[in-house]
């Protein structure tokens, strides 16, 4: 089994069967408290939860965020996620396509996933550090074409790589690679973190590089320091991974920083968002979409219906937050009053 494939299996085992969450740090949404509106002047049953993102209309402002399915179970997991996304009318991002491109393994990331995710946006995914390597920029368009994607996620994950055995430790030139990427792909480029967050300063550099959208993927949910520590056999790195378990910028902080500087930049909030109320708070802080990965992974290992049930519960809670703030449309949450 290839090293990358084995690592993906370890990731899956860690997230599904062990507590890989941050210990003390949260995503920061407890600091946002809506003011209750006793005269909402809207009908609960007709509240509009639909939204538009990068030119696509979505029934709900949700994204099935990029996640690893592991080599053994990737195809089943990705197919269930795609089926659920299509049924719900929400967007879906696939996990890293590095293995499928470099080792000729589909891992559920071929044309089938496009057929299952019919009628909804589907996003490709590659690591920024790998794109910097000579000759690898062309992999971006290959990744898009492999699944007929509507946009390309490029994940920036330096701290995860630092804790990873044989990870990409040299990040010199990564921003330049991102700048060079724009003319090589025919879809929008979305930069995302993996759970450590993107600051306002880094967002500015990314905007200057020409990216189309950002997924803040902030701290507060799964700790990828902890996950990589679990996968390590080096005791020094294991200890260091535990020390840095809570490293990162809370998701709410990322949103506030970036939205203040870029009022119109398409933003995705992910990282430590567990329910529809927290999704409402993320939208209030400026998110256009709300993504979940770890929170829905276990459901995806069981059935498509459980994934659908999960997001329908999220939608109910989001609708309640809209009603309680007098927001007839989900986008009106940006103007909801706070205590």
Curated annotation (Swiss-Prot):
Q: Which GO terms describe its biological process?
A: isoprenoid biosynthetic process
Binding-site residues, FMN: 65-68, 96, 125, 192, 222, 293-294
Keywords for this protein: Cytoplasm, Flavoprotein, FMN, Isomerase, Isoprene biosynthesis, Magnesium, Metal-binding, NADP
**What does this protein need as cofactor?**
FMN; NADPH; Mg(2+)
Give the main EC class.
Answer: isomerase
Residue stretches in coiled coil: none
Record-annotated residues binding substrate? Answer: 7-8, 96-98, 160
Q: Name one GO molecular function term.
A: isopentenyl-diphosphate delta-isomerase activity
Instruction: Tell me which residues bind Mg(2+).
Output: 161
Record-linked SUPFAM superfamilies:
FMN-linked oxidoreductases (SSF51395)
Give the EC number(s) listed in the UniProt record: 5.3.3.2
Does the entry feature the keyword DNA damage, yes or no?
no
Fetch the HAMAP family from UniProt: Idi_2 (MF_00354)
Q: Indicate what this protein is called per its UniProt record.
A: Isopentenyl-diphosphate delta-isomerase
Source organism (scientific name): Vibrio parahaemolyticus serotype O3:K6 (strain RIMD 2210633)
Output the lineage of the source organism. Answer: Bacteria, Pseudomonadati, Pseudomonadota, Gammaproteobacteria, Vibrionales
Q: Which gene is this protein's source?
A: fni
């Amino acid at each position: 089994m290839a090293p990358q494939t084995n690592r993906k299996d370890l990731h899956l085992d860690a997230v599904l069967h062990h507590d890989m969450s941050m210990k003390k740090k949260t995503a920061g949404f407890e600091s946002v408290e809506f003011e209750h509106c006793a005269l909402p002047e809207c009908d609960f049953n007709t509240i509009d939860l639909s939204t538009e993102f990068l030119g696509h209309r979505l029934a709900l402002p949700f994204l099935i965020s990029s996640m690893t399915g592991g080599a053994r179970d990737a195809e089943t997991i990705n197919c269930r996620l795609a089926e659920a996304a299509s049924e719900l009318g929400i967007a879906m991002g696939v996990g890293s396509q590095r293995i499928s491109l470099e080792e000729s393994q589909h891992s559920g990331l071929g044309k089938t996933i496009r057929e299952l995710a019919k009628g909804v946006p589907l996003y490709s995914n590659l690591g920024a550090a790998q794109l910097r390597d000579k000759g690898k920029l062309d992999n971006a368009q290959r990744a898009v074409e492999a699944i007929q994607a509507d946009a390309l996620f490029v994940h920036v994950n330096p701290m995860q790589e630092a804790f990873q055995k044989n990870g990409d430790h040299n990040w010199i030139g990564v921003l330049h690679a991102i700048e060079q990427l724009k003319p090589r792909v025919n879809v929008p480029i979305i930069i995302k973190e993996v759970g450590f967050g993107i600051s306002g300063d880094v967002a500015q550099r990314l905007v200057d590089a020409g990216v189309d959208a950002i997924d803040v993927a902030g701290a507060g949910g799964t700790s990828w320091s902890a996950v990589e520590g679990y996968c390590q056999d080096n005791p020094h790195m294991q200890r260091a991974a535990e020390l840095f378990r809570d490293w990162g910028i809370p998701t709410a902080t990322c949103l506030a920083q970036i939205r203040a500087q870029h009022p119109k930049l398409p933003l995705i909030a992910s990282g430590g968002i567990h329910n529809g109320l927290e999704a409402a708070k993320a939208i209030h802080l400026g998110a256009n979409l709300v993504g979940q990965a770890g929170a829905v992974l276990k459901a995806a290992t069981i059935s498509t219906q459980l994934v659908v049930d999960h997001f329908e519960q999220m939608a109910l809670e989001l609708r309640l937050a809209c009603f309680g703030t007098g927001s007839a449309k989900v986008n009106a949450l940006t103007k909801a009053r706070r205590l």
